[in-house]
Amino acid sequence: MTDSAAPRLHVQALSAGCAEAARRWAERLGLPLAADDEAEFAVQVGEQGLQVLQLGADSPGPVRVDFVEGASAHRRKFGGGSGQMIAKAVGVQPGIRPRVLDATAGLGRDGFVLASLGCEVTLVERQPLIAALLEDGLERARRDPDVAPIAARMRLLGGNSADLMRAWDGEAPQVVYLDPMFPHRDKSALVKKEMRLFRPLVGDDLDAPALLQAALALASHRVVVKRPRKAPIIEGPKPGYSLEGKSSRYDIYPKKALGKG
């Protein structure tokens, strides 16, 4: 991750009824609760949960994690099921739902897709604020009767993915999934909006080769790396094969075949 000056943030309650929750989030994230005229982002706590808003006249609007409605709900209902490229990349097949470690969870979109297909997914996110958004989204998902069974298959860990993988305790994931932060060519409004949040807070994953090395050491069956379609492979071993879509590519590093069980 790049080492740039950290942006200024403050926590804001959107209503009087959310003041106590805002205080708890401010304490937990180590952020000021009072208004800051020089803040670049506001962490807002409202009736609909946690969201982050880039401040200023050209703000793209708030970013939050919502697995119940919006894009995640649409993809869950109409996204193509096990025929999706991500499903093929991680090895979803009839009778096979691999255990997946999503080591670059972000806002959890890919992890949710895999969990909706029946995979047990452990998500790791190292940026505390992004992890907080994801935690909040998962908590709300667990209260929805339609989405709760999917959210129950998702476990969130905070921390540095490479360190967690090197010190992994217990049964290894069958698949480690990586989607390192690189300059994205996707021009959709949603991606551009999220990138404006992620870039200042997270930066690019310049340690991607170390992540790949740790993933290859941990995964029992395969490592999958999501990349922009025309981007070079991550420095290190070459993938066994790739699956290519319109804007993205999945580089697959197989170790052994996934079996039913």
Swiss-Prot record:
EC number per UniProt: 2.1.1.242
SUPFAM superfamilies documented for this protein: S-adenosyl-L-methionine-dependent methyltransferases (SSF53335)
Key words of the record: Cytoplasm, Methyltransferase, rRNA processing, S-adenosyl-L-methionine, Transferase
Chief place where the protein resides: cytoplasm
Enzyme class, UniProt record, top EC level: transferase
One Gene Ontology MF term: rRNA (guanine-N2-)-methyltransferase activity
Reactions catalysed, as given in the entry: guanosine(1516) in 16S rRNA + S-adenosyl-L-methionine = N(2)-methylguanosine(1516) in 16S rRNA + S-adenosyl-L-homocysteine + H(+)
Record: residues binding S-adenosyl-L-methionine: 109-110, 125-126, 179
One GO CC annotation: cytoplasm
Pfam family, one: SAM_MT
Subcellular location: Cytoplasm
Family statement: Belongs to the methyltransferase superfamily. RsmJ family.
Function, as annotated: Specifically methylates the guanosine in position 1516 of 16S rRNA.
Protein name per UniProt: Ribosomal RNA small subunit methyltransferase J
Organism: Pseudomonas aeruginosa (strain LESB58)
